[in-house]
Amino acid sequence: MGSQPKRAAQEGAFETALSLLHRRGRIDALGTGGPELDGLIGGLEPGLFYLFYGSEDGGLPDELLLRLLVEAAARGRAVYLVCGNYRRSRTVLDSERLLSLIDGAGLDPDDALSRIHVVCAFSERHLIRAPDLVEEVLGRVDGVALVAVQQLAKLFHGRLALRREDPSEFTGVVSRLRELCFERGVVLAASCRPSGRGRPAPEPEGGSFLRHAANVIVYLRASRRGGTVSAYLVKHPDSARSGRMVSFSEEGWAWGG
């Protein structure tokens, strides 16, 4: 995959607005598989950090990560970091759903799965070490288009968090993952839960640093009556996009059937 952000940094400390516009116009963004969501965020640009959050019970953010894994496997490779203490929070890799999406995309299951490299973090200490494992994969294989992190904030935040490590370690994990992906021109996409309530969207779990670190933040919510999914764009580098919302049917959301 290309590494546009890294090359731009190497060419000089400054870049004109015109050259930036031309460069972004050539970027091969990763699609979500859903036209409404792609239209809202403009696809996922290499080197940027995307945070998708919503109710974990509804499963929308984690479902989206699975879709992104399939999109990445169709063009190259992906790293999937699964976070959560299984005994306390039942965080799992939904392999059946992933296979369903792969089949729906018309990909060969064995080939697609061989392109997805899984890293698991079952404790805060595991998560602190996870960036080293991700870096190892990025250095060992070519063509990684995506690093997806399921429930990034779960081990350090929330009522079931054990809190055995300094909270500042979480900041280090996010910074390291962001830096690794930016330098290599790889999309970083993470899911997390909302923290409390708020309108038009609650804050994402993970504290103020996570909100500032993410380049794009999207809140996903299913309608109370069912049948519809709403995506609210909380943050985007293009400020004109921020605050927009799209809705689409759950049938359209369930890529791959």
What is each stretch, according to the model?
Residues 2-108:
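The Walker A/P-loop phosphate-binding site
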Residues 47, 76, 113-116, 213-215:
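Short, well-ordered alpha-helix to beta-strand connector turns
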Residues 50-52, 80-82, 117-119, 189, ...:
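Hydrophobic/aromatic beta-strand patches that form the interior of the parallel beta-sheet core
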Residues 80-161:
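Conserved inter-motif catalytic segment of the P-loop NTP-binding fold
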Residues 132-212:
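P-loop NTPase motor core
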Residues 178-257:
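Phosphate-binding/switch region of NTP-binding enzymes
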